[in-house]
């Protein structure tokens, strides 16, 4: 027997412009599916948004989810919207909560933003590239060692403002994030996943509920995309088995092809980019979680544990 959807759904999210744009997508999809349901937004400022230093000094990736989770668990909100890449995979979700749906995946690629429209290969020696992502820093060090990465934290709008103020010469940002805030006009070049392997969970929004809210879970689960669910499951299990931390340069991309076959390509780097471990497997008869485990084990056999444990965090 189908349960009726709740009359009101309070949606909690980070209060950045990008996060609130993501909430509007969720509200629109809910309205299309359940026209009679009202929604309210509960914006919260997270530790990760307030702290612009090294994330390892606060709570790593959990710095972007702690306050959102607290609002959900306290009953202040009913539904949380997360970027999957910001949700720690080295630990379970907070007790009493579940992911009810993964929305259809957006673009996973990174973009270069340069005021004069230069491409990555056109950047001259010593160009200051703004990014605080250890994943991006390691890959740039490996392929473009003549560039200089400078720490750049803050939401996308803030980073664009800092670029305009001359604090860097170029920026690396997620294509999906620029799409969400309507700023694709600043993109100089979209980087292929071969040039810049994306982070785990790139371009995926997850809807999180309290596990006892069965009517709400049923109402929002229909927003989920089956292909994205398979990809997210493989990627998050991969990261869970690796037990990476926020200073670990780890990248990975699971993909369901047109025939429905799932594969996972992943890498672990040293921070200086001088060592890169690679693994790429097709699921075949394996379920997504088992594929993620298999790829992680393949990298562990190559020495990933020693690299990860050797990085301060």
Curated annotation (Swiss-Prot):
Enzyme class: transferase
Pathway: Porphyrin-containing compound metabolism; protoporphyrin-IX biosynthesis; coproporphyrinogen-III from 5-aminolevulinate: step 2/4
Cofactor binding mode and count: Binds 1 dipyrromethane group covalently.
InterPro entries xrefs: HemC (IPR000860), Porphobilin_deaminase_cofac_BS (IPR022419), Porphobilin_deaminase_N (IPR022417), Porphobilinogen_deaminase_C (IPR022418), Porphobilinogen_deaminase_C_sf (IPR036803)
GO biological process: heme biosynthetic process; protoporphyrinogen IX biosynthetic process
Cofactor entry: dipyrromethane
Gene Ontology CC annotations of this record: cytoplasm
Keywords: Porphyrin biosynthesis, Transferase
This enzyme's EC code(s): 2.5.1.61
Record bears the keyword Iron: no
Enzymatic reactions: 4 porphobilinogen + H2O = hydroxymethylbilane + 4 NH4(+)
PTM sites of type S-(dipyrrolylmethanemethyl)cysteine: 246
Molecular function terms, GO-annotated: hydroxymethylbilane synthase activity
Subunit and partners: Monomer.
Family of the protein in this entry: Belongs to the HMBS family.
Miscellaneous remark of the record: The porphobilinogen subunits are added to the dipyrromethane group.
Function in brief: Tetrapolymerization of the monopyrrole PBG into the hydroxymethylbilane pre-uroporphyrinogen in several discrete steps.
Family annotation (NCBIfam families): hemC
Protein name from the UniProt record: Porphobilinogen deaminase 2
The organism's taxonomic lineage, starting at the top: Bacteria, Bacillati, Actinomycetota, Actinomycetes, Kitasatosporales
């Amino acid at each position: 027997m189908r349960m009726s959807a709740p009359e009101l759904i309070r949606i909690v999210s980070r209060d950045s412009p990008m996060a609130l744009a993501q909430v509007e997508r969720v509200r629109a999809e809910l309205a299309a599916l359940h026209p009679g349901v009202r929604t309210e937004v509960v914006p919260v400022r997270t530790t990760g948004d307030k702290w612009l230093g090294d994330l390892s000094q606060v709570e790593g990736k959990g710095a972007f989810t702690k306050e959102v989770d607290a609002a959900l668990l306290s009953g202040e909100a009913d539904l949380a919207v997360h970027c999957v890449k910001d949700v720690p995979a080295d630990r379970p979700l907070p007790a009493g909560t579940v992911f009810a749906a993964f929305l259809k995946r957006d673009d996973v690629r990174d973009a270069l933003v340069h005021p004069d429209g230069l491409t990555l290969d056109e950047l001259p020696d010593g160009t200051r590239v703004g990014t605080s992502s250890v994943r991006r820093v390691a890959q740039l060090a490996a392929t473009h060692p003549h560039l200089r990465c400078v720490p750049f934290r803050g939401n996308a709008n803030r980073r664009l403002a800092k670029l305009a103020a001359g604090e860097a010469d170029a920026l690396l940002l997620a294509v999906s994030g620029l799409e969400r805030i309507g700023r694709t006009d600043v993109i100089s070049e979209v980087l292929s996943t071969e040039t810049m392997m994306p982070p785990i969970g790139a371009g995926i929004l997850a809807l999180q509920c309290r596990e006892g809210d069965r009517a709400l879970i049923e109402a929002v689960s229909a927003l989920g995309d089956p292909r994205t669910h398979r990809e997210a499951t493989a990627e998050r299990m991969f990261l869970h088995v690796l037990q990476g931390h926020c200073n670990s340069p780890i990248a990975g991309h699971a993909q369901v092809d047109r025939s429905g076959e799932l594969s996972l390509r992943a890498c672990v780097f040293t921070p200086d980019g001088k060592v890169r471990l690679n693994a790429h497997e097709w699921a075949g008869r394996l379920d997504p979680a088992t594929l993620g485990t298999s790829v992680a084990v393949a990298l562990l056999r190559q020495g990933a544990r020693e690299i990860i444990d050797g990085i301060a965090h």
